[in-house]
């Protein structure tokens, strides 16, 4: 056997040895499925696992995370969108296979499409103007997401040529026209320190929501002062003897909360060694034992404050604002521009948007408020539905209430028992003892505690 063949076989062996081992158990908890992931420690592996679970629309109710030397053990209690445990055997097998291969078999991503990344100052009707420009330039929007936060907007849009269905980035003149017109729309207000940013690229496998977090982070949306009474409660304390910084968070529970927090810690180069996450009614409590990638805990007060601000911003970006409108109809050229124009003409601001097209069916979600960020008069919503189509546009709950009810049922807690958890706004419930107790029971702690 040649040396190169030996090397290839060795590499395959290493990959097989380091592939995550997944156990999915439906017998432990009455209302949730337990997903246990045992894996070799590597940069970003926790984020990949959380990302995969959230991309499958699984609600993470509780989690215990620990590393011991070169190995990780992550335990997630998950449910579906209705708050029920997973019973579909095909789905369970798919989750196992996806987690076991996700770290070594990357997806192809958005091949055959052109990616547009936009960052700028938010204003009423901006997204409507963006989609109108793309329609005029015969660019079909296949998938897009847009977030707004602290007066800023970040969006990632995948487009193709409206006639040929091919990427547009092969035509440099057309790309320049697209960039130029979008940049004019996104020009920052006078005196704002950050420039408008646009970027055109081909395909790629960038996770859209992680990229939006990165765009907002680069745009420093976290620097604006937060409303203390409404902001997530975040504290950062050092444990000098153990060499960790302990990050505690308390906020309203919602889908993808853990992903948003872990994504931000990862992008800020903090490594999670141990963590515990739990929910009490509508409130989520998260605790992380972290170090910076240089091996040190948080080393200064400015760094501590910046970490707190960035985590608060990461949670707030996805916080539901306004009324959720869902559009489901046959796709056609200019549909998105037409629908958003009607919203703009009725004085509605799009606080968040999720656009997708599959098999010639457009499925779009808009979170809308009035121009001042307040709730909308129901009569205006009724008028808009009549213009767009009663059967095509519907008003939905922001998130399924049944998920919260399932958590309360599992924990035998009445909703009113935890209404005052935010009282005072300064005291966090420490999960330190909970972390250690569960990690000892799992046999995962040897030297860290």
UniProtKB/Swiss-Prot annotation:
Keyword terms of this UniProt record: Repeat
Domain of life: Eukaryota
Database matches in InterPro entries: ACR1-12, ACT-like_dom_sf, ACT_dom
Expression by tissue: Expressed in roots, leaves and stems.
Pfam families given in the database record: ACT
Domain ACT, chain residue ranges per copy: 34-112, 115-197, 246-322, 324-404
CC terms in the record's Gene Ontology section: cytosol
Gene Ontology MF terms: amino acid binding
A GO BP entry: cellular response to hypoxia
Induction section of the entry: By cold stress.
UniProt xrefs under PANTHER family: ACT DOMAIN-CONTAINING PROTEIN ACR4-RELATED, ACT DOMAIN-CONTAINING PROTEIN ACR7
Function: May bind amino acids.
Protein name per Swiss-Prot or TrEMBL: ACT domain-containing protein ACR7
Species, as recorded: Arabidopsis thaliana (Mouse-ear cress)
Gene that encodes it: ACR7
